[in-house]
Regions:
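Glycine/Thr-rich phosphate-binding loops of Rossmann-like dinucleotide-binding domains
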Residues: 16, 81-82, 126-127
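N-terminal Rossmann NAD(P)H-binding glycine-rich loop of SDR-like oxidoreductase domains
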Residues: 5-26
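NAD(P)H-binding glycine-rich loop region in Rossmannoid oxidoreductase-like domains
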Residues: 35-99, 107
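SDR active-site strand-loop-helix element
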Residues: 9, 33, 71-77, 116-122
Length: 137
């Protein structure tokens, strides 16, 4: 897998900003999804090319991922509560992680993009009340 042309969602989050810096510093051309003019400026300042599009629009994502080799889906909406344990706390994050992923997969198929990278996120296991989480949890 080459990282020549990378498309990133979640570009202005804590992880996204660091990934963009790393990729740009290592010679990758990075295109990043933006939801606002302010975010677009931040993305430019990081060395990437911002594109305004809707994460939930197959048509828009298919258009802005033409010529891309790798998609990195880093977008999340982690609740800001100390212990987010109600399903409603996770509604937007679930939409981003489920519907957004499906939309990106459609765009990837349409543009013959072979790689979509999506990291895991905090709180996948919920509140374990002090119980240790491991690979068998």
């Amino acid at each position: 897998m080459t990282m020549d042309n990378v498309f990133i969602t979640g570009a202005t989050g804590g992880l996204g900003r660091r990934v963009i810096k790393y990729l740009v510093n290592n010679g990758s051309a990075v295109t990043a999804l933006s939801r606002s003019e302010g975010n677009s400026k931040l993305i430019w300042d990081l060395g990437a090319r911002p594109v305004m599009a809707d994460l939930f629009s197959s048509e828009e994502l298919t258009e802005c991922t033409k010529g891309i080799g790798v998609i990195m889906h880093l977008a999340t909406s982690i609740p800001r509560k100390a212990i987010p344990n109600k399903p409603s706390d996770w509604q937007m994050n679930d939409r981003i992680r489920i519907e957004g992923t499906k939309t990106l997969l459609k765009a990837a198929r349409s543009n013959q993009i072979k790689y979509l990278i999506q990291p895991s996120i905090t709180y996948v296991y919920g509140n374990r009340h002090g119980e240790t989480v491991n690979s068998e949890s």
